[in-house]
């Protein structure tokens, strides 16, 4: 049985970054251990960049990324105590469900008996029992994201980053996946930072919302307050534009 764990504090201290020829971005952020935070904002505002800076896929020009008690600013992604799920490309197409989940324990898939037990438990926990030997192409979109969540379970990292992983799913399946994330959070108490364009995602999963605009955190507050119209005018305009596009 998986032992309960605790999330880690995530702190971005004067973190500066710019793509070549792009706008300068700056992030200052403190996320307490085990909190769930939603990131919302226009496309290109910096949501994915913020997540990639935490995960280590982008290197800041200056500033620090702190996770728990450690400075991880210069660490490569595989050495950071972070798991991340994207909208696509979470799985290796030539590996089975069991193998894709097993990568969370060992990149060489040399698994101990304890590792195999953890993989089996995670597969069952995410509703994939009986599909261990299937390839990703034999799964539905929702099932593929369940495999990604199962891999998160066996990695047992204190921080989970979600970059619109359920955006391509229909409303019912999307809600089901968000509920599964919430259930895993209750058990493992990991810190969760989720980028989304859908206010329903934020409302369902998080109590705190950050509005990202022009490469910075433009507003930070309770999700309920933002969605009740108490956020900045720019957030209301953003939601209005999203509704027009749907």
UniProtKB/Swiss-Prot annotation:
Keywords, sorted A to Z: ATP-binding, Cell inner membrane, Cell membrane, Membrane, Nucleotide-binding, Translocase, Transport
Keyword Transmembrane: no
Reactions that this protein is recorded to catalyse: thiamine(out) + ATP + H2O = thiamine(in) + ADP + phosphate + H(+)
Residues reported to bind ATP: 41-48
Transmembrane segments: none
A GO molecular-function annotation: ABC-type thiamine transporter activity
SUPFAM superfamilies for the chain: P-loop containing nucleoside triphosphate hydrolases
E.C. no: 7.6.2.15
Database matches in NCBIfam families: thiQ
Protein name in the entry: Thiamine import ATP-binding protein ThiQ
Gene name as annotated: thiQ
């Amino acid at each position: 049985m998986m032992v309960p764990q605790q999330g880690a504090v995530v702190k971005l201290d004067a973190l500066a970054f710019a793509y070549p020829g792009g706008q300068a971005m700056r992030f200052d952020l403190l996320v307490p251990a085990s909190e769930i935070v939603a990131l919302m904002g226009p496309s290109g505002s910096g949501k994915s960049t913020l997540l990639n800076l935490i995960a280590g896929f982008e290197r800041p020009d200056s500033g620090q990324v702190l996770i728990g008690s450690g400075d991880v600013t210069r660490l490569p992604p595989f050495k950071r105590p972070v798991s991340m799920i994207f909208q696509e490309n979470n799985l290796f197409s030539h590996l089975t469900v069991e193998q894709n989940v097993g990568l969370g324990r060992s990149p060489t898939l040399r698994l101990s008996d304890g590792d195999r037990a953890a993989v089996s438990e995670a597969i069952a926990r995410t509703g994939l029992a009986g599909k261990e030997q299937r390839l990703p192409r034999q799964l539905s979109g929702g099932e593929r994201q369940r495999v990604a969540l199962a891999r998160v379970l066996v990695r047992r990292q204190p921080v989970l980053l979600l970059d619109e992983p359920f955006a391509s799913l229909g409303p019912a399946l999307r809600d089901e996946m968000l509920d599964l994330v919430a259930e895993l959070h209750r058990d493992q108490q990991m810190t969760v930072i989720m980028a989304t364009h859908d206010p329903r995602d934020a409302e369902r999963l998080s109590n705190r919302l950050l509005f990202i605009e022009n490469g910075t955190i433009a507003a930070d507050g309770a999700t309920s307050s933002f969605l009740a119209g108490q956020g900045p005018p720019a957030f209301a305009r953003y939601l209005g534009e999203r509704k027009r596009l749907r």
